[in-house]
Amino acid sequence: TLPQSAGEIPADVFATAVNQVAVAAGKDDSLPTLTGVHIEMNKTTITLAATDRYRLAVKEINWNPKDQNLEAATLLRARTLIDAAKSLAGGGQITFALSPTASNEKLVGFVSEEKTMTSRTLDGSFPPFRHLLPTESTAEAVIEVAPFLDSVRRVALVTDKTVPLRLVF
Protein backbone atom coordinates (compact mmCIF):
# COMPACT_ATOMS: atom_id res chain seq x y z
CA THR A 1 0.00 0.00 0.00
CA LEU A 2 1.05 3.56 -0.61
CA PRO A 3 2.39 5.45 2.40
CA GLN A 4 0.66 8.55 3.77
CA SER A 5 0.95 11.74 1.68
CA ALA A 6 3.47 14.24 3.08
CA GLY A 7 3.09 17.06 0.55
CA GLU A 8 3.48 18.25 -3.03
CA ILE A 9 6.18 19.74 -5.24
CA PRO A 10 6.18 20.77 -8.92
CA ALA A 11 7.45 17.85 -11.03
CA ASP A 12 9.95 19.93 -13.02
CA VAL A 13 11.47 21.45 -9.85
CA PHE A 14 11.82 17.97 -8.34
CA ALA A 15 13.43 16.52 -11.49
CA THR A 16 15.93 19.38 -11.76
CA ALA A 17 16.94 19.09 -8.10
CA VAL A 18 17.37 15.31 -8.31
CA ASN A 19 19.54 15.60 -11.43
CA GLN A 20 21.72 18.25 -9.77
CA VAL A 21 22.29 16.21 -6.60
CA ALA A 22 22.28 12.54 -7.63
CA VAL A 23 25.48 12.90 -9.68
CA ALA A 24 27.43 13.19 -6.42
CA ALA A 25 26.11 9.90 -5.02
CA GLY A 26 28.57 7.03 -4.76
CA LYS A 27 28.53 3.98 -7.01
CA ASP A 28 30.22 1.59 -4.57
CA ASP A 29 27.62 -0.87 -3.23
CA SER A 30 29.90 -1.79 -0.33
CA LEU A 31 29.00 1.65 1.11
CA PRO A 32 25.21 1.61 0.61
CA THR A 33 24.46 4.84 2.48
CA LEU A 34 26.68 6.72 0.05
CA THR A 35 24.78 5.35 -2.96
CA GLY A 36 21.73 7.20 -1.74
CA VAL A 37 20.31 10.69 -1.68
CA HIS A 38 19.47 12.02 1.77
CA ILE A 39 16.08 13.75 1.80
CA GLU A 40 15.13 16.07 4.67
CA MET A 41 11.66 17.59 4.78
CA ASN A 42 10.36 20.37 6.97
CA LYS A 43 7.53 22.91 6.86
CA THR A 44 9.09 24.99 4.06
CA THR A 45 11.82 23.05 2.26
CA ILE A 46 13.02 19.71 1.04
CA THR A 47 16.80 19.32 1.19
CA LEU A 48 18.44 16.75 -1.08
CA ALA A 49 22.07 15.79 -0.36
CA ALA A 50 24.43 13.20 -1.82
CA THR A 51 28.12 12.41 -1.48
CA ASP A 52 30.65 9.85 -2.65
CA ARG A 53 33.23 10.98 -0.03
CA TYR A 54 35.04 13.23 -2.54
CA ARG A 55 32.24 15.58 -3.52
CA LEU A 56 29.04 16.79 -1.94
CA ALA A 57 25.93 18.12 -3.66
CA VAL A 58 23.13 19.81 -1.72
CA LYS A 59 19.96 21.38 -3.08
CA GLU A 60 17.12 23.01 -1.14
CA ILE A 61 13.73 23.42 -2.78
CA ASN A 62 10.46 24.88 -1.54
CA TRP A 63 7.42 22.66 -1.28
CA ASN A 64 3.88 22.42 0.09
CA PRO A 65 3.73 19.98 3.02
CA LYS A 66 0.39 18.67 4.27
CA ASP A 67 1.56 18.92 7.89
CA GLN A 68 3.15 22.27 8.84
CA ASN A 69 4.94 20.55 11.75
CA LEU A 70 6.59 17.93 9.54
CA GLU A 71 10.22 17.12 10.30
CA ALA A 72 11.31 13.97 8.46
CA ALA A 73 14.40 12.51 6.84
CA THR A 74 14.95 9.47 4.67
CA LEU A 75 17.64 7.93 2.50
CA LEU A 76 16.72 6.72 -0.96
CA ARG A 77 18.90 5.01 -3.55
CA ALA A 78 20.09 7.63 -6.07
CA ARG A 79 19.28 5.41 -9.06
CA THR A 80 15.70 5.00 -7.80
CA LEU A 81 15.32 8.74 -7.32
CA ILE A 82 16.67 9.47 -10.81
CA ASP A 83 14.22 6.96 -12.32
CA ALA A 84 11.33 8.49 -10.35
CA ALA A 85 12.24 12.01 -11.44
CA LYS A 86 12.50 10.92 -15.07
CA SER A 87 9.27 8.99 -15.22
CA LEU A 88 7.20 11.49 -13.22
CA ALA A 89 8.54 14.65 -14.91
CA GLY A 90 6.49 16.49 -17.45
CA GLY A 91 4.50 19.06 -15.57
CA GLY A 92 2.00 19.00 -12.80
CA GLN A 93 2.63 18.16 -9.19
CA ILE A 94 4.34 15.21 -7.53
CA THR A 95 2.97 14.05 -4.21
CA PHE A 96 5.52 12.68 -1.74
CA ALA A 97 4.27 9.86 0.43
CA LEU A 98 6.14 8.63 3.52
CA SER A 99 5.62 5.66 5.80
CA PRO A 100 5.12 6.74 9.40
CA THR A 101 8.38 6.66 11.37
CA ALA A 102 6.85 4.24 13.86
CA SER A 103 6.17 1.65 11.15
CA ASN A 104 8.73 -0.86 9.92
CA GLU A 105 7.72 -0.48 6.28
CA LYS A 106 10.32 2.18 5.39
CA LEU A 107 8.60 3.14 2.14
CA VAL A 108 8.58 6.30 0.07
CA GLY A 109 6.01 6.90 -2.64
CA PHE A 110 5.81 9.36 -5.52
CA VAL A 111 2.49 10.08 -7.19
CA SER A 112 1.86 12.14 -10.31
CA GLU A 113 -1.34 12.57 -12.28
CA GLU A 114 -0.58 9.46 -14.34
CA LYS A 115 1.90 7.32 -12.39
CA THR A 116 2.60 6.00 -8.92
CA MET A 117 5.98 4.71 -7.73
CA THR A 118 6.91 3.17 -4.39
CA SER A 119 10.40 2.33 -3.13
CA ARG A 120 12.04 1.03 0.02
CA THR A 121 14.42 3.35 1.79
CA LEU A 122 18.06 2.51 2.48
CA ASP A 123 19.10 1.49 5.96
CA GLY A 124 21.80 3.49 7.66
CA SER A 125 22.50 7.12 8.45
CA PHE A 126 23.71 9.69 5.99
CA PRO A 127 26.88 11.39 7.28
CA PRO A 128 26.48 14.86 8.81
CA PHE A 129 27.25 17.45 6.15
CA ARG A 130 25.93 20.86 7.17
CA HIS A 131 29.10 21.76 9.08
CA LEU A 132 31.03 21.38 5.80
CA LEU A 133 29.07 24.16 4.13
CA PRO A 134 30.15 27.74 4.76
CA THR A 135 27.51 30.02 6.23
CA GLU A 136 28.79 32.93 4.15
CA SER A 137 31.27 33.42 1.34
CA THR A 138 33.73 36.21 0.75
CA ALA A 139 34.17 35.73 -2.98
CA GLU A 140 32.10 35.07 -6.04
CA ALA A 141 33.29 33.93 -9.47
CA VAL A 142 31.43 34.21 -12.75
CA ILE A 143 32.90 31.95 -15.40
CA GLU A 144 31.97 30.70 -18.84
CA VAL A 145 30.89 27.08 -18.54
CA ALA A 146 32.22 25.62 -21.81
CA PRO A 147 35.86 26.81 -21.50
CA PHE A 148 35.88 25.85 -17.81
CA LEU A 149 34.66 22.32 -18.54
CA ASP A 150 37.20 21.96 -21.35
CA SER A 151 39.99 22.89 -18.94
CA VAL A 152 38.75 20.47 -16.28
CA ARG A 153 38.55 17.64 -18.83
CA ARG A 154 42.13 18.30 -19.99
CA VAL A 155 43.41 18.29 -16.40
CA ALA A 156 41.44 15.12 -15.62
CA LEU A 157 43.37 13.23 -18.30
CA VAL A 158 46.67 13.61 -16.42
CA THR A 159 45.64 13.54 -12.76
CA ASP A 160 44.70 10.85 -10.29
CA LYS A 161 40.92 10.64 -9.81
CA THR A 162 41.28 10.76 -6.03
CA VAL A 163 43.18 14.06 -6.02
CA PRO A 164 40.86 17.05 -5.65
CA LEU A 165 40.96 19.76 -8.28
CA ARG A 166 42.13 23.01 -6.71
CA LEU A 167 40.94 26.29 -8.21
CA VAL A 168 42.91 29.48 -7.66
CA PHE A 169 41.39 32.84 -8.61
Language-model-detected regions and their locations in the chain:
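Structural preference for solvent-exposed beta-strand-turn elements
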Residues: T1-F169
